[in-house]
């Protein structure tokens, strides 16, 4: 005899095999079991407070839910496709354990508000883990910057050598981008920190549900304002996926730089062997696979965001079965963000820099041409447009003759313009001087780098406090 569905009273026929296969979500939403049990325990306590359950009944339900958690933890729990999802799987097992008492648990609750609460609890829990990983990455960026305040590397625009920068400036540029990522992930935590239980299917519930008790017991910051909004929106998932997509764009751009800068054509950086792989046919190869894989995963995470946006855009209020698909991109993104953050951290820690190769590229790329033009303006009183033209002629001559600004003979410089033979020429094209002339707030000058590192340390202290707030706001998730 087929097992009757928990919602089957209205139906004469059981769902077809196809309906069961297309409708099941237990193959993926079992990820929520801890949070579903956590919410159910709080719900049972609330039912006791309002007189639906006796104290003895509530204790039995809580004990039963604890046993189910142990069964799932140990791998002994049998997930059945016929039970559709994690909510029905747990309730069905609870009914096996407790008989009709298990059927009382769903009083004053719909799967619509139940799943919405589960996902919020899941996001809160995972945000804590992700924020710790991003924080660790920030400390590595800062440590790398501190070690390379005097190392000069090329800065690029249009993938053409533009101006010299201190390597610390480069590493700090990624530090500040990831600071914003941390803050956006923190904001995603706050968006999920909400009680939606008590919203029912969409209109609320017919019982005197004590939502304030539920909020406190689940350690949530606030209650949802509108039951229809609570069960039909997925902004809490959007918020996380937006933050994740931005993080992965930042990560992918860094990975692209690693791929370029570790190639033979650049050779500014070198990755340690344990973060690279070889070729099955070419024995000389040392491939930056971690960087390439993370770059590829960026498209995957952005695709997860697109998946959810497109899925939701055509659905009327309130709940629709389409929403079952919201968890696949969520779970996958959590997994990808965690492993990619670790990968970026390990690459940053392991990068070896070759300043001599960077210097060669800076010289060959005429990276201080702008500084030379500015020197003609400030020291020699030449109008900027005229100075720009003089230096442009000099660069063209060097390119044709195989010189750079450092190797072209004084006599040949004088053929272009007499001012280029001035003794101040050498200082004007100095790589270090070029960096230190950028003595503005946020610039690459050495004093400004030291200031920026100090501010970065202060920012880390600020983020440390936010991590502690997360720990105090987070539920113990059973």
From Swiss-Prot:
GO terms for molecular function: argininosuccinate lyase activity. This is Argininosuccinate lyase. CDD domains: Argininosuccinate_lyase. One of its GO terms (cellular component) is cytosol. InterPro entries: Arg_succ_lyase_C, Argininosuccinate_lyase, Fumarase/histidase_N, Fumarate_lyase_CS, Fumarate_lyase_fam, Fumarate_lyase_N, L-Aspartase-like. The keyword Kinase does not apply. It comes from Leptospira biflexa serovar Patoc (strain Patoc 1 / ATCC 23582 / Paris). Transmembrane segments: none annotated. It is found in: Cytoplasm. It holds the Pfam family Lyase_1. It comes from the Bacteria.
């Amino acid at each position: 005899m087929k097992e009757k569905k928990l919602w089957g009273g209205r139906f004469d026929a059981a769902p077809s095999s196809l309906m069961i296969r297309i409708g099941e979500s237990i193959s993926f939403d079992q990820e929520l079991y801890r949070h579903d049990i956590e919410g159910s325990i709080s719900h049972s306590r609330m039912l006791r407070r309002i007189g639906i359950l006796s104290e003895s009944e509530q204790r039995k339900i809580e004990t039963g839910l604890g046993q189910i958690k142990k069964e799932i933890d140990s791998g002994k729990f049998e997930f059945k496709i016929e039970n559709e999802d994690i909510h029905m799987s747990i309730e069905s097992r609870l009914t096996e354990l407790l008989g009709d008492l298990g059927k009382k648990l769903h009083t004053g609750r719909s799967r619509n508000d139940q799943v919405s609460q589960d996902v919020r609890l899941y996001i809160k829990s995972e945000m804590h883990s992700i924020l710790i990983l991003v924080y660790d990455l920030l400390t590595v960026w800062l440590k790398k910057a501190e070690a390379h305040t005097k190392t000069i590397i090329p800065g690029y625009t249009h993938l053409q050598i533009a101006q010299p920068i201190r390597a610390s400036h480069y590493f700090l540029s990624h530090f500040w981008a990831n600071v914003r990522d941390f803050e956006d992930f923190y904001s995603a935590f706050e968006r999920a920190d909400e009680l939606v239980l008590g919203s029912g299917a969409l209109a609320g519930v017919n019982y005197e549900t004590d939502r304030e008790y539920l909020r406190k017991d689940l350690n949530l910051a606030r209650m949802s304002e509108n039951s229809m909004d609570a069960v039909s929106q997925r902004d809490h998932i959007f918020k996380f996926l937006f933050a994740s997509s931005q993080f992965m764009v930042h990560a992918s751009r860094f990975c692209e730089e690693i791929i370029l800068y570790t190639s033979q054509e650049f050779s500014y950086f070198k990755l340690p062997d344990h973060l690279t792989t070889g070729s099955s046919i070419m024995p000389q190869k040392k491939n930056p696979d971690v960087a390439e894989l993370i770059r590829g995963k960026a498209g995957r995470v952005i695709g997860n965001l697109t998946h959810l946006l497109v899925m939701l855009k055509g659905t009327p209020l309130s709940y629709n079965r389409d929403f079952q698909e919201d968890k696949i991109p969520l779970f996958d993104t959590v997994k990808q963000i965690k492993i990619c953050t670790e990968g970026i951290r390990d690459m940053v820690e392991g990068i070896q820099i070759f300043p001599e190769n960077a210097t060669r590229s800076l010289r060959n790329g005429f990276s201080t041409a702008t500084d030379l033009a500015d020197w003609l303006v400030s020291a020699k009183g030449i109008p900027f447009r005229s100075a720009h033209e003089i230096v442009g002629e000099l660069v063209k001559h060097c390119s044709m003759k195989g010189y750079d600004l450092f190797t072209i003979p004084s006599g040949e410089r004088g053929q272009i313009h007499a001012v280029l033979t001035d003794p101040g020429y050498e200082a004007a094209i100095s790589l270090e001087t070029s960096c230190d002339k950028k003595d503005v707030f946020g610039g690459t000058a050495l004093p400004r780098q030291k200031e920026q590192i100090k501010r970065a340390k202060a920012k880390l202290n600020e983020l440390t406090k936010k991590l502690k707030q997360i720990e105090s706001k987070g539920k113990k998730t059973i």
